[in-house]
Amino acid sequence: MMSASRLAGTLIPAMAFLSCVRPESWEPCVVPNITYQCMELNFYKIPDNLPFSTKNLDLSFNPLRHLGSYSFFSFPELQVLDLSRCEIQTIEDGAYQSLSHLSTLILTGNPIQNLALGAFSGLSSLQKLVAVETNLASLENFPIGHLKTLKELNVAHNLIQSFKLPEYFSNLTNLEHLDLSSNKIQSIYCKDLQVLHQMPLLNLSLDLSLNAMNFIQPGAFKEIRLHKLTLRNSFDSLNVMKTCIQGLAGLEVHHLVLGEFRNEKNLEKFDTSALEGLCNLTIEEFRLAYLDYYLDDIIDLFNCLANVSSFSLVSVTIKSVKDFSYNFGWQHLELVNCKFGQFPTLELKSLKRLTFTANKGGNAFSEVDLPSLEFLDLSRNGLSFKGCCSQSDFGTTSLKYLDLSFNDVITMGSNFLGLEQLEHLDFQHSNLKQMSEFSVFLSLRNLIYLDISHTHTRVAFNGIFNGLSSLKVLKMAGNSFQENFLPDIFTELRNLTFLDLSQCQLEQLSPTAFNSLSSLQVLNMSHNNFFSLDTFPYKCLNSLQVLDYSLNHIMTSKKQELQHFPSSLAFLNLTQNDFACTCEHQSFLQWIKDQRQLLVEVERMECATPSDKQGMPVLSLNITCQMNKTVIGVSVFSVLVVSVVAVLVYKFYFHLMLLAGCIKYGRGENTYDAFVIYSSQDEDWVRNELVKNLEEGVPTFQLCLHYRDFIPGVAIAANIIHEGFHKSRKVIVVVSQHFIQSRWCIFEYEIAQTWQFLSSRAGIIFIVLQKVEKTLLRQQVELYRLLSRNTYLEWEDSVLGRHIFWRRLRKALLDGKSWNPEGTVGTG
């Protein structure tokens, strides 16, 4: 089943992937002129052939080795620069000068040995600096004190031994995240945090994970306020952990994270006594992660954290929990991927959010008493419910969000009495029982989102969705309907905007199934068993934008139905269906071709039958269909008549074309001053002499040339007549021996004679390019007679001859045309 976000992502056009239109072949653009990814291209220097407008540049894995001053001067608009693993050893003063807009700089994995004091000068807008694995040994010598806009500094996986925060940290007033994980820090002293007493950074999140901590001086964190402190895999033993946590006394932290990582284990054993020091901290939110040790009880841990607002356990094994009693002031409790002996007893008066997901043990749900609860996530636990769901199950009437997805058998025994405030309800991939026996959701008039996908539900009761008057999203994929027929079950869902009916084995649907869904925008009918596209049921969906009918067995559509798609429809998916590419369905196949702008991935729509056309794209299909005898008889008679007419017209075809053109264009303006007829053997003279002198000289003339002005895909004869003669004021005939021997040239010349006869304004100018043998010339009687009786121009390649030639030719072309002093000639 395609999720809503994926469906929308495939159907709403995003930015097209474009390649650079530049002479270089290396740059694979993501967004031309803005984003360039140039990884692993073996660059030894910064490329200088990228546009000034570049904003995002990835040069990672190139052997740059050295960054000199003004290395990025050509990219003043740069915002993100990635120089990961470029073997950079030296960064000189002003290397990033002029990058006043740069917000992110990544230097990961560079063995930096020489870092100038002014290396980061000019970065007046830098917010994120990543210097992971850069051989950094101390924060003291890191020249970043002037980066007042810096919000995130990541120097993890380095050689830093001292936690002392330099004096320049008082300038970094916007710093929100400092990552010192996986360094060599072992001890923290009071003097190390002196700068935080002088200039508190109240929003600072500090990560000290994966440091082999063995000592935190008592009082080092006294009266220090942090937004977040993370200490995971930071202690080698239980005693060290206990001592260091006691050293945190006096710290006020919004979010404290302790524990280990999934694949990183330092502690051999663990018990809650190591956390006794937490009673001396002021904590708002607490998380304990990946302590996969068998804890007998964690009630002592709860006592020190009774007043936190959020308590979270991730991947913790707990042998037993007596209860979560009213004594705790938690508002959010999260238990994820933990192991319990049984489902815990929950009686928490102030709790508003409970996340209990992917846990093991205690498969039977026990009633809880959570009077303030608004958000409840019980997904992925394999839980069983008997008589779900009502206020008595959860001990609250304030619940707005309930997720029971990916559980075991859930028997519906109540229609959510006391849970009328629910807005989000998710049952997907749980096994629902008794869903079609009564109106389960009758009380949920505030529900906006409902997911019952893949819940083994068989819809046999038309009132299954009664009461859901506010519902906007309904997902019920992977279920089934009685007789594989979709009845009128959506009559009360007038506000529905998204409906997923995929994988429901549907074969038919009621013509009025969707009549009430005037607000529906997205409808997924994919992975069903429809054999024809019946569009009639969608005529009332005036807001429908996306319709997915992919992966059905559609062969065709009902002949009268194609007109009923709503005008609002923007995306229709018919891919991977069983299209029958036969004459019987020719109108439907033609409709597909006509609607290619509407259809999603239309190029993937292929024929399934007949066998000789299987796999053929529908768009490339060209069917020659047989006709009945009457049609054949009429066609034969028509062909005979047309043949007789064609024989009579054949000899006069081009004359008629010219006559029609003269009538059509006779009173209009000409596009060209002259159409040039010449042999391809003389093309060099035409390009270098005729075109250059007439189109670039004074006055200028516009010539029609077949290699430049004829329309591709149109017959040569049609181009000669329509583009050459009809749109030109005169004709220039370049006579040479090659011309006389060319059948095309003689054809053009004969058409020119007819054109001159039909058009009163037409004129033919002859240019004899080279001496022509009279015996050869006499083979073309009409041409010989015309040259004998009319004045023509002869080309003479001398200074005086060229001057006279061009003066006479321009005079002939100017005949009947206006010319202004600026040297331009109107085409008339």
UniProtKB/Swiss-Prot annotation:
<dbReference type="GO" id="GO:0032731">
    <property type="term" value="P:positive regulation of interleukin-1 beta production"/>
</dbReference>
<keyword id="KW-0812">Transmembrane</keyword>
<dbReference type="GO" id="GO:1900227">
    <property type="term" value="P:positive regulation of NLRP3 inflammasome complex assembly"/>
</dbReference>
<comment type="subunit">
    <text>Belongs to the lipopolysaccharide (LPS) receptor, a multi-protein complex containing at least CD14, LY96 and TLR4. Binding to bacterial LPS leads to homodimerization. Interacts with LY96 via the extracellular domain. Interacts with MYD88 and TIRAP via their respective TIR domains. Interacts with TICAM2. Interacts with NOX4. Interacts with CNPY3 and HSP90B1; this interaction is required for proper folding in the endoplasmic reticulum. Interacts with MAP3K21; this interaction leads to negative regulation of TLR4 signaling.</text>
</comment>
<keyword id="KW-1015">Disulfide bond</keyword>
<feature type="repeat" description="LRR 15">
    <location>
        <begin position="519"/>
        <end position="540"/>
    </location>
</feature>
<keyword id="KW-0832">Ubl conjugation</keyword>
<feature type="glycosylation site" description="N-linked (GlcNAc...) asparagine">
    <location>
        <position position="628"/>
    </location>
</feature>
<feature type="glycosylation site" description="N-linked (GlcNAc...) asparagine">
    <location>
        <position position="307"/>
    </location>
</feature>
<keyword id="KW-0677">Repeat</keyword>
<feature type="topological domain" description="Cytoplasmic">
    <location>
        <begin position="651"/>
        <end position="828"/>
    </location>
</feature>
<comment type="similarity">
    <text>Belongs to the Toll-like receptor family.</text>
</comment>
<dbReference type="InterPro" id="IPR003591">
    <property type="entry name" value="Leu-rich_rpt_typical-subtyp"/>
</dbReference>
<protein>
    <recommendedName>
        <fullName>Toll-like receptor 4</fullName>
    </recommendedName>
</protein>
<dbReference type="InterPro" id="IPR032675">
    <property type="entry name" value="LRR_dom_sf"/>
</dbReference>
<keyword id="KW-0391">Immunity</keyword>
<dbReference type="InterPro" id="IPR000157">
    <property type="entry name" value="TIR_dom"/>
</dbReference>
<keyword id="KW-0520">NAD</keyword>
<dbReference type="GO" id="GO:0034142">
    <property type="term" value="P:toll-like receptor 4 signaling pathway"/>
</dbReference>
<feature type="repeat" description="LRR 6">
    <location>
        <begin position="174"/>
        <end position="195"/>
    </location>
</feature>
<dbReference type="Pfam" id="PF01582">
    <property type="entry name" value="TIR"/>
</dbReference>
<dbReference type="GO" id="GO:0004888">
    <property type="term" value="F:transmembrane signaling receptor activity"/>
</dbReference>
<feature type="glycosylation site" description="N-linked (GlcNAc...) asparagine">
    <location>
        <position position="171"/>
    </location>
</feature>
<feature type="repeat" description="LRR 16">
    <location>
        <begin position="543"/>
        <end position="563"/>
    </location>
</feature>
<feature type="domain" description="LRRCT">
    <location>
        <begin position="577"/>
        <end position="627"/>
    </location>
</feature>
<keyword id="KW-0325">Glycoprotein</keyword>
<feature type="repeat" description="LRR 8">
    <location>
        <begin position="225"/>
        <end position="245"/>
    </location>
</feature>
<feature type="glycosylation site" description="N-linked (GlcNAc...) asparagine">
    <location>
        <position position="280"/>
    </location>
</feature>
<feature type="glycosylation site" description="N-linked (GlcNAc...) asparagine">
    <location>
        <position position="33"/>
    </location>
</feature>
<dbReference type="GO" id="GO:0002755">
    <property type="term" value="P:MyD88-dependent toll-like receptor signaling pathway"/>
</dbReference>
<keyword id="KW-0675">Receptor</keyword>
<keyword id="KW-0966">Cell projection</keyword>
<dbReference type="GO" id="GO:0045087">
    <property type="term" value="P:innate immune response"/>
</dbReference>
<feature type="signal peptide">
    <location>
        <begin position="1"/>
        <end position="23"/>
    </location>
</feature>
<feature type="repeat" description="LRR 10">
    <location>
        <begin position="398"/>
        <end position="420"/>
    </location>
</feature>
<dbReference type="InterPro" id="IPR017241">
    <property type="entry name" value="Toll-like_receptor"/>
</dbReference>
<feature type="repeat" description="LRR 13">
    <location>
        <begin position="470"/>
        <end position="493"/>
    </location>
</feature>
<feature type="glycosylation site" description="N-linked (GlcNAc...) asparagine">
    <location>
        <position position="495"/>
    </location>
</feature>
<dbReference type="InterPro" id="IPR000483">
    <property type="entry name" value="Cys-rich_flank_reg_C"/>
</dbReference>
<feature type="disulfide bond">
    <location>
        <begin position="388"/>
        <end position="389"/>
    </location>
</feature>
<feature type="repeat" description="LRR 3">
    <location>
        <begin position="101"/>
        <end position="122"/>
    </location>
</feature>
<keyword id="KW-1003">Cell membrane</keyword>
